A protein has these predicted regions:
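A short alpha-helical cap/connector motif
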Residues: 1-172, 176-226
């Protein structure tokens, strides 16, 4: 039986559990550890980077799916990019979208040190702009999408993504717990938590999609087309 402490919003037991999970699985690759350190030292928002456990889940999902076309919305310093690259098909392409070009020097420093880095294609701009201009005839249908961009626009991103997915395409949405504040009598309100609640409800009610929320990081929702 699952302990009820796992369902509490109090971060004490949850953080203990996350630390246990992170230290019980495969260790963080050296390149990613170096990028993690650089992110904390050279940016003001290191907390936006995926934790070690989430990164290993992204890498494992990518290895299972073996996408020929992968898409990441919200590159930040490129940590998740390198995790997804680990499982990319040898002939695949990983598209990643970031609007803040001040982060590009970190990409350019660390990505070339990864095997297969030449298959990363960086888009400078807004997530929705890339989705709206995506041409499946030239870029291909998307086998795996990792969504970690503008939370207020996450539902529009979902609707734009769905017709671009391959027949058995996967989507992963980050931060779908929003620090455990989306439910209960003191649930957070505002554009971002409201958008995430709407996303969770939308995914749950769609019979064409199979959805599971993983207790990873700040909540990682995996979605697969039936």
């Amino acid at each position: 039986m699952m302990s009820t402490s796992l369902l509490k919003t109090d971060l004490g037991p949850r953080m203990d559990l996350l630390e246990f999970a992170s230290t019980s699985g495969s260790p963080e690759p050296a390149l990613l550890a170096a990028l993690r350190t650089a992110t904390w030292q050279r940016t003001r928002h290191g907390r936006l980077m995926s934790d070690v456990h989430t990164g290993r889940v992204l890498a494992m999902v990518s290895r299972m799916v073996r996408p020929r076309v992968a898409l990441e919305l919200g590159t930040f310093t490129g940590y998740g990019t390198l995790c997804l690259l680990e499982g990319l098909h040898p002939e695949g392409t990983l598209h990643t979208v970031e609007r803040n070009d001040e982060l590009f020097p970190l990409h350019d420093e660390f990505w070339p040190r990864a095997e297969g880095h030449g298959r990363i294609h960086r888009h400078h701009g807004e997530a929705m702009a890339v989705l709206e201009n995506w041409d499946p005839e030239t870029l291909g249908t998307i086998d795996c999408a990792y969504v970690d961009a503008d939370k207020q626009g996450i539902n529009a991103q979902l609707e734009a993504l769905l017709p671009l997915l391959s027949k058995k395409g996967w989507m992963l949405f980050d931060n779908t717990w929003w620090n455990g504040t989306l439910g209960g009598p003191e649930a957070a309100t505002g554009p971002k938590p409201d958008a995430l609640r709407a996303l969770n409800q939308r995914l749950r009610m769609d019979s064409t999609l199979e959805t599971v929320v993983l207790p990873v990081g700040d909540g990682l929702t995996m979605v697969r087309k039936h």
